[in-house]
Amino acid sequence: MFQGADSQAGKSGSRSMKPPGGESSDLFGSPEEGISSSKPNRMASNIFGPTEEPKNIPKRTNPPGGKGSGIFDESTPVQTRQRLNPPGGKTSDIFGSPVTATAPLAHPNKPKDHVLLCEGEDSKSDLKAATDSTPRGEQSDKGSSKEVEHAKIPEPTPTVDSHEPRLGPRPRSHNKVLNPPGGKSSLSFY
């Protein structure tokens, strides 16, 4: 006949009170059982100090024989090396050799006209040396050669017709993106 919940109330051991895998499959741990392990808890944090270690286990850096392996004794000459450059300075001392400070490298597709303006006194002295090394016959014919040299050498002005293809595409005067990173869409934004 029909047996309800009243008939199971009298039984002391019911199946619903046991875990599905038996009593040994305690995945999350229960507060009733004490952990009886000689190893420290791996998840324990050592923020507030070192954990207590057993006293009977010898440390590997100090063997029972009394003599060390000598691995850690020779590390002092490496630490006596002095720093030549401050950290984060203009030069990098990663590999141990001093590197002279150089001008930042320009993009390979851009013209290098701005380099003469940025370098400073060195480029000006090079320009003066170049004007002084003109042939002597021209100086006697023209009088003051420096004024004539500056008038004769105009600054290069890039034009669209004289564009070199090795420098990349021709410069554009508008801001329309022709090839966006995500590809073209059917919408056009001007």
UniProtKB/Swiss-Prot annotation:
Residue numbers spanned by region Disordered: 1-190
Give all cystine bridges in this chain: none
The protein's matches in InterPro entries, at most eight in alphabetical order, are given as: JUPITER (IPR033335)
What is the superkingdom listed in this entry's lineage? Eukaryota
Q: Which residues carry this modification: N-acetylmethionine?
A: 1
In the record, N6-acetyllysine modifications are located at: 11
One GO CC term, this protein: cytoplasm
Keywords attached to this Swiss-Prot or TrEMBL record, sorted alphabetically, are: Acetylation, Cytoplasm, Nucleus, Phosphoprotein
Ranges annotated as biased composition (Polar residues): 1-15, 35-44
Residues modified as Phosphoserine are 30, 45, 69, 97, 144
Localization per record:
Cytoplasm; Nucleus
Q: What is its main location?
A: cytoplasm
Comp. bias (Basic and acidic residues)? 110-129, 138-153
Q: How does it assemble?
A: Monomer. Dimer. Interacts with TPCN1.
Per the record, the similarity remark reads: Belongs to the JUPITER family.
Summarizing the function annotation, the protein's role is: Nicotinic acid adenine dinucleotide phosphate (NAADP) binding protein required for NAADP-evoked intracellular calcium release. Confers NAADP-sensitivity to the two pore channels (TPCs) complex. Enables NAADP to activate Ca(2+) release from the endoplasmic reticulum through ryanodine receptors.
Q: What is this protein called?
A: Jupiter microtubule associated homolog 2
Natural source organism: Mus musculus
